[in-house]
Amino acid sequence: MAGPVSLRELLMGASAWLGSESPGGPSAEGGGNAAGTPEPPWREDEICVVGIFGKTALRLNSEKFSLVNTVCDRQVFPLFHHQDPGDPGTGIKTKAVSVGEAGGAGDPGAAAGDSLRGGMATAEGNRAEPGPQDFSLLQAYYNQESKVLYLILTSICDNSQLLRACRALQSGEAGGGLSLPHAETHEFWKHQEKLQCLSLLYLFSVCHILLLVHPTCSFDITYDRVFRALDGLRQKVLPLLKTAIKDCPVGKDWKLNCRPCPPRLLFLFQLNGALKVEPPRSQDTAHPDKPKKHSPKRRLQHALEDQIYRIFRKSRVLTNQSINCLFTVPANQAFVYIVPGSQEEDPIGMLLDQLRSHCTVKDPESLLVPAPLSGPRRYQAMRQHSRQQLSFHIDSSTSSSSGQLVDFTLREFLWQHVELVLSKKGFDDSVGRNPQPSHFELPTYQKWISAAAKLYEVAIDGKEEDLGSPTGELTSKILSSIKVLEGFLDIDTKFSENRCQKALPMAHSAYQSNLPHNYTMTVHKNQLAQALRVYSQHARGPAFHKYAMQLHEDCYKFWSNGHQLCEERSLTDQHCVHKFHSLPKSGEKPEADRNPPVLYHNSRARSTGACNCGRKQAPRDDPFDIKAANYDFYQLLEEKCCGKLDHINFPVFEPSTPDPAPAKNEPSPAPPDSDAEKLKEKEPQTQGESTSLSLALSLGQSTDSLGTYPADPQAGGDNPEVHGQGEGKSEKRPNLVDRQASTVEYLPGMLHSNCPKGLLPKFSSWSLVKLGPAKSYNFHTGLDQQGFVPGTNYLMPWDIVIRTRAEDEGDLDTNSWPAPNKAIPGKRSAVVMGRGRRRDDIARAFVGFEYEDSRGRRFMCSGPDKVMKVMGSGPKESALKALNSDMPLYILSSSQGRGLKPHYAQLMRLFVVVPDAPLQIILMPQVQPGPPPCPVFYPEKQEITLPPDGLWVLRFPYAYVTERGPCFPPKENVQLMSYKVLRGVLKAVTQ
């Protein structure tokens, strides 16, 4: 053979002349066959097959290819490999070169090599190259002179292929363009180990002798589990391999055992200069003494042999009967060889020294070179003489004298085993009392090619996707059998799984610590995070993610299996205390024994609330829906208390079909800042109204001169400016029911600023009740209702200037009212305030903002964050401050409990005493129960005119709900003024 080729190339090229061979027998040596492909001249040679595998270091002199160069005494593989980054192999010749050296292996082999590579070109064109995930490569070289076929395995244990695999991981080729996580990366490397084991299994099935090359002088204990894995895999796939070679022209024992003989395994260790024998100082280094009988190198070899044999015997890789073993080692021959380290660290310097020695003739060399030689012949003789020195760092054999033992060269070490094969003696490595002879067969090159090609096709090169063919079926079965390797090779995963399995119970305990019987999703996530922290402290390795996912599943199963608390929260932000349950349907009774139970929501929180008018209090359950919160509770008290009182009913949905549908939760067509614009429009108007009322009261003028209020068209006002301003203001004020309400769709929640127009709810969350006439309220005693904190049951006075024409009022121009805080031109304020008045110029109304907490305690507030305290016969403060401000929806209760959490009271009622006077008081409540973008809530009728001479009570909603969910009450450390009743809740218009 001219040079090394890939084994796949060799086998596929040989199949060309093997497949076209006539049944009559082989053609003449060197002749052509029917296909025109020349046959190799060594096809009938009986060959010894030597396989080389192992690991390589970063040093140049530790390459496995240099060993073949040394044994063959020629440069079969190049000393330097200029490898393309995309080249799959190292040192592969894709084009044959003729070797014309002496030794008889050149010219015929070159021709055969050309024919082989030429004959396989078509076959390779029909088959895709091996996938990028397989980094194992087999190369072959046949030395015709020694009749030895060398098979060299290059895998991820070699630097070149390991570098390619790392680049593939770094660039994302192994993960489909994405970087792989730790577990997948570990799986990638283990998959490469399994593919390497398949290549090793092939070598152990076709070789007589195997050389294990290791870059150090210590035995790698991981080979023990690799060989045990290979032994188990071989026993698993042996029936499949028998099927593959049953028609090959080999012996019966070969077909039965799927190998020519139990291969003999030899070990080659690299010393790397760690053990050197220095000559004495007085001794000339050019003439060293002969080695001692027991040199350190020989003692190290013997120690390694004993260690390796003892390890393999303990692990049952080697047994007494060699026929049952994966490989054998000789009992009376050396099977360990130590390659000494190189003294030349620089390969360039080594080559220069060799070139210098070839070109320089010294006296000792001139004696060895014949005198008549000159020119090229003299150079060839010198090169032949110095070839012994350039032995690829393999020491030469030293002469023996006085019976001293000498060290073998690598060729001598290997050839003592090769000669046993070529002489057909075989290996008798069985030990024990009754050793059984093992089979042995020395095949010809043609027979070996036939069997090796079949095994290569099913074990390495078979196409898994072609399951219809017999080869594809065998390949798929072999690939499925490599799972037997996991128990031997994946020690890291086995350790990681054991470690993670021990950490899992600790994580479960951390999850279940301090857990109530039923708990919510939030508690589940918090406990799961704690369990994962405990798990991550103890779990390690590639199985970390797998058991972390199992921890997730286990905790979720524990939670959902009878420990899941109902996730529903009440409108006051309290959790339902029942475990996971379903709600009763219409007409269905609750059943606690069903799975899941059928129950109503219950938070076990109870509060005390008053009815619509406030005269009667009753306990109430924590509501979970808006109807129970704002309608059902008050309807029950209506029958007992305020059912006979006068009501102003708010418009609600009146269906025109038997099955009305709720409106879909669509966003409001209004612009996003509509609420803010409305508030901006309302604030100056309300502030102007309140300020003008205050100034009018202090200056003694009527509201007829206040242009900020819209005049009542029925009042017959004579000021065109007042009418114009009033119309402009009324146009800006939003009116959500400016068109006829829908009778098909209803609003499922409450009416607010983001609701679509024309929709009404089925019930109103607001209530407006008349307690009695205006005189039913006593200014000195306050409201006579239960639940009020003493001194807080009073309404604040609101003095409203009504229009009355005095006798001496003619000198005043009502159309020219001075600016605020400025006196009337030409007159003093004190004079104006006390002149020209009658008792009916001022009408007194009363206003009260009532707050109620969950314990039923009630109190009035005279302003924002100011609880009313009346010590005498009535309040002294005016209602103007409260009417001119945004009143908080929630305020700290006047009597806090013993707990650390603050206790809030909620604005629940607005009391208004409308006097019997020529004026109108318009009610316009607007509530924003949260910070922006919380919408503004208002009743179904936005402006309600309160009839005169009455004590009216506006009951606010208990809870505020939008289509996105409830607006929960404030929690700790929250600005309470973000929850407010907007200013301008009351407006007075004189008639």
Curated annotation (Swiss-Prot):
Presence of the UniProt keyword Membrane in the record: no
Keyword rRNA processing: no
Pfam families: Smg8_Smg9
Segments of skewed composition (Basic and acidic residues): 278-289, 675-684, 720-736
Post-translational modification: Phosphorylated by SMG1.
UniProt superkingdom: Eukaryota
Residue(s) carrying Omega-N-methylarginine: R898
Record PTM Phosphoserine, positions in chain: S115, S469, S668, S742, S895
Sequence ranges of Polar residues compositional bias: 685-706
Start-end of Basic residues biased regions: 290-299
The entry's keywords: Methylation, Nonsense-mediated mRNA decay, Phosphoprotein
GO biological process: nuclear-transcribed mRNA catabolic process, nonsense-mediated decay; regulation of protein kinase activity
Family membership: Belongs to the SMG8 family.
Description of how the protein assembles with itself and partners: Component of the SMG1C complex composed of SMG1, SMG8 and SMG9; the recruitment of SMG8 to SMG1 N-terminus induces a large conformational change in the SMG1 C-terminal head domain containing the catalytic domain. Forms heterodimers with SMG9; this assembly form may represent a SMG1C intermediate form.
Name of the featured protein: Nonsense-mediated mRNA decay factor SMG8
Species in which this protein is naturally found: Mus musculus (Mouse)
